[in-house]
């Protein structure tokens, strides 16, 4: 079982990676974190805080920086990055979907505060990734989930046939 986490270093991407790590530990699953780095848009990398204002833009440097962020949250996760010719959300989501086709995840963990909206903005990377029916999608909206009562492992479930 593999979990895929599109990762851009944002608060909600951190939350999605942390959540995937929790589920992976419980289910003995592998995690693949993927970052899409636009080659044409140095400003995008600066906006994501992948590159300092006085630092030269270099895809390898950005990939190394983001990989360290991933390892800090999910040391067991595999990391891969993809280059994109543009920073458009559509292109980034296309790259993520391509990786999903290669990795064949059971679940994609998306950190997004708008992926679950009934009307998904065209500019939403998460919305474009979430529409694929080849995998389940776990949308993470908060770093810590609300309190969930412990589930008894008695094996008795509502509606269970005996």
Describe the residue ranges of each PLM region.
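Intrinsically disordered or low-complexity boundary/linker segments at protein termini
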Residues: 1-14, 132-162
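Small/aliphatic-rich secondary-structure junction motif
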Residues: 2-47, 162
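Short, well-ordered secondary-structure micro-motifs
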Residues: 16, 43-47, 90-94, 120-121, ...
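Short, solvent-exposed amphipathic alpha-helices that sit
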Residues: 19, 57-70, 95
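Short, structured coil segments at secondary-structure junctions
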Residues: 27, 125, 132-134
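Acidic, proline/glycine-rich short linear motifs
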Residues: 37-61, 148-162
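Structural beta-alpha unit
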Residues: 71-108, 135, 144-147
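Glycine-rich, Arg-bearing micro-motifs that act as flexible, cationic patches
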Residues: 107-128, 146-147
């Amino acid at each position: 079982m593999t979990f895929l986490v599109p990762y851009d270093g944002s608060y909600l991407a951190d939350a999605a990676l942390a959540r995937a790590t929790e589920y992976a530990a419980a289910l003995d699953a592998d995690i693949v974190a993927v970052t899409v780095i636009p080659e044409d848009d140095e400003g995008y990398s600066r906006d994501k805080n992948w590159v300092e204002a006085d630092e030269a833009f270099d895809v390898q440097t950005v990939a190394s920086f983001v990989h360290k962020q991933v390892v800090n949250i999910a040391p067991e996760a595999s990391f891969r990055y993809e280059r994109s010719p543009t920073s458009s959300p559509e292109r980034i989501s296309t790259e993520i979907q391509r990786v999903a086709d290669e990795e064949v995840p059971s679940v994609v963990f998306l950190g997004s505060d708008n992926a679950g909206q009934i009307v998904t903005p065209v500019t939403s990377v998460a919305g474009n990734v979430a529409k694929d029916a080849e995998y389940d999608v776990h949308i993470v909206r908060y770093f810590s989930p609300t309190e969930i009562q412990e589930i008894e492992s008695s094996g008795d479930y509502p509606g269970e046939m005996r």
